[in-house]
């Protein structure tokens, strides 16, 4: 009888911990979105027409639906937020993540290119050994016609940030990868 009660209490604690973690992550995400939408720390934003959105979905935003009729993007130093009528997507850029490349060619149809890198240090409790794993994620963000200056401003802002903080850049690049002396990762 006591075993059943202990198992039930343990199961309840696991469910509560999982629910608390989910609530925390959701609240953190909602705060990041609210900060971006307030516009206080915005680097750039633009809207996609229905036709531009269809192209963006076909090329890069596979998580969205073409039938949404348009979409919006908001870019801040800490996140990129993309939304449409049916879905949204938040790309967090804070914490241990470092943008190591940002560029825009400035021609029609050229995307804004952003590379994000981060590292994860895993510790083995038994042997006290550490292993470091390096990760990178590339984002190609379609730029609507007429938003060239905004995309150039975003690319310039992140490139300058990377060049001014080379220590963060070199910290997230593995020893077996080439490092640019200009603080700009090739894409």
Question: Which role does the model predict for each range below?
Answer:
Residues 2-75:
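Anionic N-terminal interaction surfaces
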Residues 4-7, 76-77, 160-166:
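Amphipathic repeat-derived elements
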Residues 9, 13-19, 96, 169, ...:
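Low-complexity, intrinsically disordered/propeptide-like segments
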Residues 40, 51, 78, 86, ...:
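Intrinsic-disorder/low-complexity loop/linker signature
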Residues 44, 76-82, 148-150:
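N-terminal, helix-rich and Lys/Arg-enriched segments in bacterial and organellar proteins
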Residues 63-120:
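Phosphoinositide-binding peripheral membrane targeting modules
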Residues 97-187:
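Acidic, Ser/Thr- and proline-rich intrinsically disordered linker/docking segments
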């Amino acid at each position: 009888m006591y075993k059943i009660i202990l198992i039930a209490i343990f199961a309840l604690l696991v469910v509560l911990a999982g629910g608390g973690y989910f609530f925390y992550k959701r609240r953190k995400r909602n705060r990041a979105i609210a900060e971006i939408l307030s516009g206080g720390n915005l680097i750039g934003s633009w809207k996609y027409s229905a036709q531009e959105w269809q192209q963006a979905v076909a090329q890069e935003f596979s998580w969205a639906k073409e039938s949404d009729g348009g979409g919006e993007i908001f870019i801040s130093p800490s996140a990129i937020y993309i939304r449409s009528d049916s879905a949204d997507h938040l790309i967090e850029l804070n914490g241990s993540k470092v943008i190591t490349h940002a560029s825009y060619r400035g021609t029609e149809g050229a995307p804004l290119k952003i590379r994000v890198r981060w590292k994860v240090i895993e510790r083995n409790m038994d042997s006290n050994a550490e292993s470091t794993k390096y990760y990178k994620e590339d984002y190609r963000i379609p730029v609507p016609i007429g938003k060239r200056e905004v995309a150039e401003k975003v690319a310039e802002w992140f490139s300058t940030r990377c060049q001014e903080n080379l220590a963060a850049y070199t910290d997230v690049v593995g020893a077996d990868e080439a490092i640019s002396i200009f603080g700009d990762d090739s894409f």
